[in-house]
Amino acid sequence: MARRCQLTGKKANNGFAVSHSHRRTKKLQQANLQWKRVWWPEGNRFVRLRLSTTAIKTLESKGINAMAKEAGINLNKF
């Protein structure tokens, strides 16, 4: 499974690790992803999603239905 947030689409960022001597080596900055069971009122059940912590915070204010509609995902498949 890809390391990508299922609601926002967040994924890893390519960056540089810069040493004290200013040498640069490529490094992946991964998104902070967590498995989360979210209550889905319309389906009357829990839905298990892999979400970024930013998405979890947004989920509390917007709600699961609004975010799923924006992402274009069908919650019946989860």
Curated annotation (Swiss-Prot):
**MF terms in GO:** structural constituent of ribosome
| Residues annotated as transmembrane | none
Task: Show the InterPro entries listed in the entry.
Answer: Ribosomal_bL28, Ribosomal_bL28/bL31-like_sf, Ribosomal_bL28_bact-type, Ribosomal_bL28_sf
Record keyword Ribonucleoprotein present? yes
Instruction: Look up the record and report any one GO term of the cellular component aspect.
Output: ribonucleoprotein complex
Question: What processes in GO biological process is this protein linked to?
Answer: translation
At the top level, the lineage of the source is Bacteria
Name of one Pfam family that matches: Ribosomal_L28
Gene3D superfamilies xref list? Ribosomal protein L28/L24 (2.30.170.40)
Keywords noted in UniProt? Ribonucleoprotein, Ribosomal protein
| Family that this chain belongs to | Belongs to the bacterial ribosomal protein bL28 family.
Designated name of the protein = Large ribosomal subunit protein bL28
Q: Lineage of this protein's species?
A: Bacteria, Bacillati, Cyanobacteriota, Cyanophyceae, Synechococcales
Whichever gene encodes this chain, its name is rpmB
